[in-house]
A protein has these predicted regions:
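Non-catalytic helical "accessory" subdomain of NTase-fold nucleotidyltransferases
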Residues: 1-214
């Protein structure tokens, strides 16, 4: 039920974001033991954890920069860079190159780049990304047939997107962690909760996907 719901939400996101320059959510990955029934808690208390990989939008790329600040867990910043899309424009695609078109024309004819929406400086901001996802999920949920049977209750969080679904006497909680893949590996940097005071541009390394395969 949960992964099917996540697939539906992801499809709505992709359709709604097709002409924008926000991160592109990919298929959710289940993590943790709750999916295999390992949790010792009452079903009402179970939190299902999923990882949603984020890909850069057209005209952008993500470059991971290792942060050597004194933390036990390896952490990174996600540097957002613009790419030249002039060749795509010449092929007839309806997109202006952020690097080579005048700023005034870009403001008038095209949505802002990711650098001007969810970034702090040149770096993808965890808290801005989570806040954006919360806003969008309110709208996306109403477009799903499931919304007629389940009640969605969002639970505020700074570094993850957490919500509860209720129907009659059933309920479960889902916590979404966002991730950016390290090249072609099973290692991600993620928005998982961190120690107090960590900058919002810091993403923590996680092996959750690699562990989920065993």
């Amino acid at each position: 039920v949960i992964m099917n719901l996540m697939d539906k939400l992801t499809d709505v996101f992709r359709q709604g974001l097709s002409n924008s320059f926000y991160p592109v959510p990919q298929q959710a990955i289940r993590v943790g033991g709750t999916f295999e029934g390992w949790s010792p808690h009452d079903a009402q208390d179970i939190v299902y954890h999923v990882l949603v990989p984020l890909s850069p939008p057209p005209g952008h790329t993500f470059r991971l920069e290792l942060n050597t600040a004194g933390m036990l867990q390896r952490n990174f910043c996600v540097h957002v860079e613009l790419l030249c899309t002039c060749a795509r424009e010449q092929l007839g695609e309806d997109m202006l190159c952020f690097l080579h078109h005048p700023k005034e024309e870009l403001r008038r004819r095209q949505d802002p780049s990711l650098l001007h929406t969810l970034c702090t400086g040149d770096y993808l901001d965890v808290e801005k990304t989570v806040h954006w996802f919360y806003r969008f999920i309110r709208v996306a949920w109403l477009l799903l047939p499931d919304s007629r049977h389940w009640r969605l209750m969002l639970q505020p969080s700074c570094r993850t997107c957490k919500f509860q679904l209720r129907k009659d006497n059933e309920s479960f909680t889902v916590e979404i962690v966002f991730g950016v893949q390290q090249r072609d590996s099973d290692i991600f940097v993620s928005s998982q909760p961190a120690e107090a005071g960590i900058p919002s541009t810091t993403w923590l390394e996680t092996c959750a996907m690699a562990e989920a395969q065993f």
